[in-house]
């Protein structure tokens, strides 16, 4: 049975080779979007990492929180690898093909795990919501409410959180 794994990463910066994951969150659903399981954990900051100030302002995860509540990167990456490589998983994110997925591949490689198996092995696949959301905005604009409280057009993930997916399936 196929399952969807909606996931997101918070990182110390944008450089997939030199930054690291600080937080991982995922929700696995069946094909009808019924929640099966939920995962969220912090990752301890490695000693060789200096977080980007911009990233810290964006995600608001302090170094103290990371160190107190986080697990080591090796353990975190093993958990992520197991989740994302579960047979018949379709991993889904928002801009994940250009950012999160590349970040994960570097983390998997750095921690001695197969970096590409979540893309093909065990009937696993991946999908990015960003191009789909863009197509809706351009060609079927009336389906979603696109403006934030200020009336400005906003297509980031927190807007999508307001949408009840089941109403549009």
Residue map of PLM features:
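A short coil-to-beta-strand element that immediately follows conserved catalytic motifs
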Residues: 35-38, 119-125
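Conserved non-catalytic scaffold segment of RNase H-like nuclease domains
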Residues: 1-109
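A short alpha->loop->secondary-structure connector
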Residues: 106-122
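Short alpha-helix plus adjacent loop in nuclease-associated cores
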Residues: 123-150
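Acidic, Mg2+-coordinating catalytic module of metal-dependent nucleases/exonucleases
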Residues: 90-99, 103, 107, 144-169
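Active-site donor-binding loop signature of nucleotide-sugar glycosyltransferases
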Residues: 43-45, 129, 165
